[in-house]
Swiss-Prot record:
Catalyzes the dephosphorylation of 2-phosphoglycolate. It catalyses: 2-phosphoglycolate + H2O = glycolate + phosphate. One of its GO terms (molecular function) is phosphoglycolate phosphatase activity. SUPFAM superfamilies: HAD-like (SSF56784). InterPro entries: HAD-like_sf, HAD-SF_hydro_IIB, HAD_sf, PGPase. It comes from Sulfurisphaera tokodaii (strain DSM 16993 / JCM 10545 / NBRC 100140 / 7) (Sulfolobus tokodaii). This is Phosphoglycolate phosphatase. The keyword Metal-binding applies. It comes from the Archaea.
Length: 226
């Protein structure tokens, strides 16, 4: 099972995070043979625009808040969260902090200037993706969503996580093999088993192609777990 972040991992910031067609084709080919999940902090409305034509096995969106798997869709929050979120939105409004409401999370773009104010929030958890912040329930993360996904699938095989930023740390914590793209933050590279020599989607694409085309490389990856 491969679990890949999207922004600056499958997609390139220079392309406004629209995934390259060549990357789409390889991911779709890979997903026809192996389990492949996109695990992103992005909201659904943006993925519909940025990932056109991409057909992975499934999705984990909003930083672990929602799992989408074939005909199943699971929100990993209860109704209490929405009352908390409403109050948090009022606090952000009062402080003049612009935000986007997802189906679960509150997303604050370019939030680093508000870090001191955001750090005072006690009712929720803040996770960072470079300079952007995601406000979410304390029990929600990419890693927790992957645990639930594996339970749903009764999956006991090897898990490979690919990422670049702070909010991928929880994803890496539940993976057998941790892979950083070449443009990953230093702290992500430091905890990775493999650092790719290419950036963003091209790096992921080459990695997937190697698994598809080189049986000995796949065996080597499986050996990481032993």
């Amino acid at each position: 099972m491969v679990l890949s972040d999207f922004d600056r991992t499958l997609s390139d910031e220079k392309d406004n995070f629209i995934i390259k067609q060549e990357v789409v084709e390889v991911v779709n080919k890979f997903s026809a043979k192996f389990l492949f999940f996109v695990v992103t902090g992005r909201e659904r409305k943006y993925m519909d625009i940025l990932a056109k034509g991409l057909f992975p096995t499934g999705w984990i969106i909003e930083n672990g808040g929602i799992i989408i798997l074939r005909d199943k869709e699971i929100k990993l929050v209860d109704e209490k969260w929405y009352k908390i979120r409403k109050n948090l939105a009022k606090i952000l409004d009062k402080n003049g902090i612009k935000y986007s409401l997802g189906e679960v999370i509150i997303y604050v773009n370019s939030a680093i200037d508000y870090k001191d104010k955001l750090d005072k929030i006690n009712e929720a958890k803040i996770e960072w993706n470079r300079s952007d912040a995601m406000i979410m329930p304390k029990n929600v993360s990419k890693g927790e969503a992957v645990k639930i996904l594996k339970s749903i699938l009764n999956f006991e095989g090897v898990t490979i996580a690919i990422g670049d930023s702070q909010n991928d740390i929880s994803l890496f914590s539940v993976a057998d093999i941790k892979v950083a793209v070449a443009n990953a933050l230093p702290e992500i590279k430091a905890i990775s088993d493999i650092v790719l020599d290419k950036e963003d989607g091209i790096g992921v694409m080459r990695f997937l192609e190697k698994i598809l085309n080189d049986g000995s490389y796949l065996e080597k990856l499986i050996g990481f777990r032993k």
